[in-house]
Amino acid sequence: MGRKPVEALAMDMLHFEKQAYRQGFQLVAGIDEVGRGPLAGPVVAAAVVVPAGVRLPGVADSKKLSAGQRESCCEDILSCGCDVGIGRVEPSEIDRVNILQATFQAMIAAVAGLKTPPHCLLIDGPYELPLFIAQKGIPQGDAKSLSIAAASIVAKVHRDRLMCEYHLKYPVYGFDRNKGYGTARHLDALRRYGPCPIHRLSFGGVRASEGEGLETAAGRQSSEGKKGRRPRG
């Protein structure tokens, strides 16, 4: 079976948008999130309205693109007249309400961040937001809808940049590379140093390391204290 040309693939990615246009919805926002699984950092969502007639041939599911490709696509999205909103929920709120509810909060904030209220939402996943806006949940929507794919790229680029900034503040965890996910280096740093202020304390990987990290810190202080004492005599 031959591969579809780029034009055909682009048309496929506009199926849900065109369906919404036929129903009378002019402003269709794609919504996606990133950062549900990491042990550290916020969950970030983006809402993107791609103007009718705009083509973004390089845009695809953010997970299938390299970091450089995502950055390039993000610049294209931001420079082609797309309306973009970003929502962010911090680790303390994730711990308070759970990651699913925090994801919904981030999505709602992203919609609120759009310059013009959308008429219809296309949401990645089988979700429905508590908003009085027509909406459709699309499982694996970032591979099926141009608007959702654009949102996935914007959210991913925004969060990756945030985690690189956090790396400058908390370098021992390697956030510039792992972006908060539970890599071997990250878990080792958690065991050695315990969690930092942007860790999600309700997540199992962080909870499991808390005692070890605190014990290591206490042991280090005890050892340093002994070294600093003067012998009696």
Swiss-Prot record:
Its main location: cytoplasm. Its EC number is 3.1.26.4. Residues 211-233 are annotated as: Disordered. PROSITE patterns: RNASE_H_2 (PS51975). It catalyses: Endonucleolytic cleavage to 5'-phosphomonoester. InterPro entries: RNase_HII, RNase_HII/HIII, RNase_HII/HIII_dom, RNaseH-like_sf, RNaseH_sf. GO terms for biological process: DNA replication, removal of RNA primer; mismatch repair. Pfam families: RNase_HII. Gene3D superfamilies: Ribonuclease H-like superfamily/Ribonuclease H. It comes from the Bacteria. Keywords: Cytoplasm, Endonuclease, Hydrolase, Manganese, Metal-binding, Nuclease. GO terms for cellular component: cytoplasm; ribonuclease H2 complex. It is found in: Cytoplasm. Manganese or magnesium. Binds 1 divalent metal ion per monomer in the absence of substrate. May bind a second metal ion after substrate binding. A divalent metal cation binds at D32, E33, D124. It is an enzyme of class 3 (hydrolase). The keyword ATP-binding does not apply. Residues 26-215 form the RNase H type-2 domain. Its cofactor is Mn(2+); Mg(2+). GO terms for molecular function: manganese ion binding; RNA binding; RNA-DNA hybrid ribonuclease activity. Belongs to the RNase HII family. Endonuclease that specifically degrades the RNA of RNA-DNA hybrids. This is Ribonuclease HII. It comes from Syntrophobacter fumaroxidans (strain DSM 10017 / MPOB). The gene is rnhB1.
